[in-house]
Amino acid sequence: MKKLVKLGLLGVGLIGKRHAEIILQSKNAKLTAVADPDQSAEKYANKIGVDYFSNLSEMISSSSLDGVIIATPNNLHVEHGLECIQKGIPSLIEKPLASSANDAEIISRAAHENGVAVLVGHHRRHNPIITAAKKIVASGEIGDVRSFHANCWLFKPDEYFDESIWRTKKGAGPVSVNLVHDIDLLRYICGEVVSVQAQTIKSRRGHENEDVASVLLKFDSDIVGTISVSDTIVSPWSWELTAKENPAYPPTSESCYLFGGDHGSLSVPDLTIWKNNDKRGWWEPIDSAKHSIITTDPLMNQIDHFCSVIKGNKPPLISAEEGLKNLKVLEGIYESAESGETFKIT
């Protein structure tokens, strides 16, 4: 009988419960315990049949865990991540890695110095659609990629903000909450970001953050492209509504990413390639063809990958260093928007 990887879950909020649901279905992992100071978490633990603890220290000392999933508020990630690292326990830390690049660097350095694996929960990288898109771009099928456009237009209703007041506070706008996913995927496909130019518009609902942002990114591969994000636009063009990852979002047949190469273009997530038949040119006929793939749940893929990381079979697909790089770009967006200047990423 296969030995299951024993996991503990810290934080039983919305994403924490989603992790629990996935682990309970996993063929490679077993959820042993959960920890959360909220009393409702104990009822949840009893409901799903696992041990309950009020904090991480108790869970680690009282359970024989192979790994821990950290799904707590961003400002607690550095404290909880360091505790796992100091105990020699691999962790999967939800995105973003920390509330600042400085805190992310502390986690990244500690993980490296102690030789303890940290996987950052940018789960979309585990989607077969993204794996296929990266391969198409890397293969040269559309030639040298010169530019891209990414769209993340959503309309979050008032009740979304009423449920959790922190969503109205500074640092909880669509750039931090939503765009960080797109930054990670674009870095994964296009390379490292070297400079950022950005404009943001203050929330019309009176929140402390932005509700619209446009960003120009330049990569070390000489790719330049734009991202537009908003949580106040009704549209079908976002990863949530196009990728069909989460059944909570009604699916559309649209795309949200466009990659333009000198031999063709690629739309994602539908993986449609547009190319001229023979001679390239704007007067020449252009046809499309779709790549077909077998889709699987990226959250389940992430848990399976975490198990492989714990066993030492694979390095983390999104290491703490990768999480740090995403936060540097994120902070660069805010710096550029505030100063009106191009911000160089170092």
What residue spans do the PLM features occupy?
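Hydrophobic residues in well-ordered beta-strands that form the structural core
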Residues: 54, 93, 118-120, 149, ...
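Beta-loop-alpha module in the N-terminal Rossmann-like domain of NAD(P)-dependent dehydrogenases
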Residues: 19, 37, 48-110
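C-terminal helix-rich "cap/oligomerization" subdomain common to oxidoreductases
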Residues: 1-4, 67-70, 268-269, 305-346
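NAD(P)-dinucleotide binding in Rossmann-like oxidoreductases
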Residues: 206-210, 220-301
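N-terminal Rossmann-like dinucleotide-binding module
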Residues: 1-48
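Predominantly a Rossmann-like dinucleotide-binding segment in NAD(P)-dependent oxidoreductases
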Residues: 124-208, 213-217, 340
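Rossmann-fold dehydrogenase core element
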Residues: 106-124, 143-149
